[in-house]
UniProtKB/Swiss-Prot annotation:
This is CMP-5'-(3-aminopropyl)phosphonate synthase. It comes from Streptomyces rubellomurinus (strain ATCC 31215). It catalyses: 2-amino-4-phosphonobutanoate + CTP = CMP-5'-(3-amino-3-carboxypropyl)phosphonate + diphosphate; CMP-5'-(3-amino-3-carboxypropyl)phosphonate + H(+) = CMP-5'-(3-aminopropyl)phosphonate + CO2. Pfam families: Aminotran_1_2, NTP_transf_3. Bifunctional cytidylyltransferase/decarboxylase involved in the biosynthesis of the phosphonate antibiotic FR-900098, a potent antimalarial agent that acts as an inhibitor of 1-deoxy-D-xylulose 5-phosphate reductoisomerase (DXR), the first enzyme in the nonmevalonate pathway for isoprenoid biosynthesis. Catalyzes the condensation of 2-amino-4-phosphonobutyrate (2APn) and CTP to form CMP-5'-2APn and then decarboxylates CMP-5'-2APn to yield CMP-5'-(3-aminopropyl)phosphonate (CMP-5'-3APn). Its cofactor is Mg(2+); pyridoxal 5'-phosphate. The modification N6-(pyridoxal phosphate)lysine is found at residue 466. GO terms for biological process: antibiotic biosynthetic process. Keywords: Antibiotic biosynthesis, Decarboxylase, Lyase, Magnesium, Metal-binding, Multifunctional enzyme, Nucleotidyltransferase, Pyridoxal phosphate, Transferase. Residues 1-255 are annotated as: MobA-like NTP transferase. Disulfide bonds: none annotated. Residues 278-628 are annotated as: Decarboxylase.
């Protein structure tokens, strides 16, 4: 919450509030059939409980609740008195057929003095009320820089916060373009003179003319147009607030009003979508230098057609993927992310060997009873292929996994060793080589793709989403010279599991091969610089990276869960702590994905501030392997 608080003088704070709590909340889905919208829980408490607590905290003495849908549940929460405040109820008998203009009009007998007028689906921090009441004698509207595309009433103010423009939806015909405007938060302080002379007369006229179908914003707007009253905009852009209309809003509000550790837990449970939450994502793995601007413009130009039309089925899409994989279409399986193929393989195959620590998806989908874990040893976490092959044979499995470069260690397996391993495990073992990050790796680490014809027991897996920087469209493929295996995998896929945006990306991608190669080189340089910066900090050992992320061991007093939390709490940076990985002492390891040079420098500076002390000599024999 924000510490820059604006305190109201006691005589500027109304002693009465009107809270609109009659709405259906239908956009919240099934819960709205058994719970009124203002009782939607946010951070463990109903929105209305937050609101009533804040009102009591600023000295409000009585609250008028306009109720309608499931009104008895509201009465059960608020009762006749709440936190020392007298509670009155006004019933809107037709909440399903009228809008909030009618609800406010029904409460008109309580609009005879200064009041807070608040909507019951808005959760906010207490300082919002203080900021509304900061100017004695002036009515005020709380407004904020938009949290999402503008919708609803917007306002403008001069440098002193005086309201200069109030634009409700009646003045928003055509394209909604109001640069510099603030979005109202549906939280008001209305002074008695404005209510009596402007608002109530406008409210009566509008309700008569619109038969309850309008919004009270119209009465505010019409009253302002008549002039003669002081109005201010309480800019709450730096304060926490959220209007909860749908489940996505509820998740956002939960996040905003939870303590930092719970916020971190919420984000980690999402496994993506972090861009909506105002954090820098160094947890998931990206190529931030691809797609280039020209490619993005091409994709944007076809947006309408791609959105409205069905994508192609598998055959033409597989041909596109085969072009990228440099294989024949019958050797390629295209899926909605490589994880989809992993899950299919888990159903079709028997027992597996998996080097650990590794990509958890293999262990999770195969199941503990069918996984034989091969422990990679610190400090370098390299895969000794002869020993691993012997382990595979002893285990009697039919499927063996290698991730190169490995996730989370960022350590790759040289191509010659992969080919040797394919021979050593024998033709009866399917060797799954996941090379989703190989494009970022230096020689001698390289793709086995050109040699699949000589190793028919190899299934190559590749995440297009990760390497090409398009995590939002979910694409991955498998390639193998065993066309019967490829056919079996394709048969497990639905006819339309690839969406139109993914198809359009595949169609355009071959025109940008050079740009992709350049992006990988840039990511490689970014990652080496990140590794070098982290290695120069006290108490940190960096495993030389072969991928677009850095695996670090914490050798000082701080553990990875604590460091990850401090990075989030203090700097809004997400990283991946590895205590959940199958490895001894996982709480000493942190994975940091590489982004732009500037973002990586922020991470290094943040870690330096947390671990303490000036940057010293590197604690590893060089942070990165030389390319070449």
């Amino acid at each position: 919450m924000n510490e820059n608080r604006t305190f109201a003088t006691p005589d500027a704070v109304p002693v009465r509030a009107v809270v609109l709590a009659a709405g259906l909340g239908s956009r919240l889905g099934e819960p709205s059939s058994r719970r009124p919208k203002p009782l939607t829980p946010v951070a463990g408490r109903p929105i209305l409980a937050h609101t009533l607590g804040h009102l009591a905290g600023v000295g409000v003495q009585e609250v008028v609740l306009v109720v309608g849908h499931l009104r008895e549940a509201v009465r059960e929460l608020a009762g006749g008195e709440y936190a020392g405040m007298k509670i009155h109820y006004v019933v809107n008998p037709d909440p399903s057929t009228t809008n909030n203009l009618r609800s406010v009009r029904l409460a008109r007998e309580f609009l005879d003095q200064d009041v807070f007028l608040l909507e019951g689906d808005v959760v906010f921090e207490p300082a919002v009320l203080e900021r509304l009441a900061a100017a004695p004698e002036a009515s005020a509207v709380a407004a904020s820089r938009p949290l999402r595309p503008l919708a609803g009433t917007v306002v403008r103010a001069d440098a002193d916060g005086v309201l200069t423009d109030y634009v409700d939806d009646r003045r928003q015909a055509g394209a909604f373009d109001h640069p510099g405007a603030l979005k109202t938060a549906n939280l008001y302080l209305l002074r008695e003179a404005f209510l009596r002379e402007r608002f109530l007369p406008a409210l009566e006229e509008l309700d008569r003319r619109l038969a309850g179908q309008g919004y009270y914003d119209y009465a505010v707007s019409d009253g302002l147009a008549a002039g003669g009253h002081a109005w201010r905009v309480a800019d709450i852009s730096d304060l926490a607030w959220y209007e909860v209309d749908d489940p996505g809003d509820q998740r956002q509000a939960d996040f905003r009003f939870s303590p930092p550790r719970e916020q971190q837990r919420i984000l980690e449970s999402l496994h993506g979508g972090y861009w909506r939450y105002g954090v820098t994502d160094h947890a998931l793995l990206y190529n931030v230098h691809f797609p280039p601007a020209e490619m993005m413009e091409i994709l944007r130009s076809d947006f309408d057609a791609v959105l409205r039309n069905y994508p192609s089925a598998h055959a033409p899409l597989t041909e596109l993927a085969a072009t990228i994989a440099a294989r024949r279409p019958e050797e390629v399986v295209l899926a909605n992310g490589s994880s989809e193929i992993i899950k299919i393989l888990a159903r079709l195959r028997g027992n597996w060997t998996v080097p650990v620590p590794g990509f958890n998806e293999y262990e999770n989908v195969v199941g503990a009873e069918r996984v034989h874990r091969y422990q990679l040893d610190a400090p370098d976490f390299r895969l000794p292929v002869e020993d691993y092959a012997a382990f595979v044979r002893r285990s009697g499995v039919d499927t063996a996994v290698v991730v190169s470069p490995n996730n989370p260690t960022s350590v790759g397996v040289p191509l010659a060793d992969l080919r040797r391993l394919a021979d050593l495990v024998g033709p009866d073992v399917l060797l799954v080589i996941d090379e989703s990050f190989v494009d970022f790796a230096p020689a001698p680490i390289a793709s086995i793709g050109p040699f699949l014809d000589r190793h028919r027991n190899v299934l190559l897996l590749k995440s297009i989403s990760k390497v090409y920087g398009v995590g939002g469209i979910r694409l991955g493929y498998a390639a193998t010279a065993d066309t019967e295996l490829a056919r079996t995998l394709r048969a497990e896929l639905p006819i339309w599991d690839i969406n139109g945006f993914a198809e359009e990306f595949l169609r355009v991608l071959p025109h940008f091969r050079r740009a992709f190669a350049d992006s990988c080189r840039q990511m490689r340089q970014n990652t080496l610089a990140l590794a070098e910066g982290l290695a120069a900090l006290p108490g940190i050992r960096v495993v030389p990276p072969d991928a677009n992320f850095v695996f670090v061991e914490l050798t000082g007093g701080i553990r990875a869960p604590e460091l990850a939390h401090e990075l989030f709490r203090r700097f809004r940076i997400l990283t991946k702590e590895c205590s959940g990985k199958s490895m001894p002492g996982g709480d000493a390891y942190l994975r940091v994905s590489s982004r732009s040079r500037a973002e990586n420098e922020v991470v290094v500076a943040a870690v330096a501030e947390i671990v303490g002390g000036p940057r010293g000599a590197a604690t590893t024999e060089g942070a990165g392997r030389a390319d070449g």
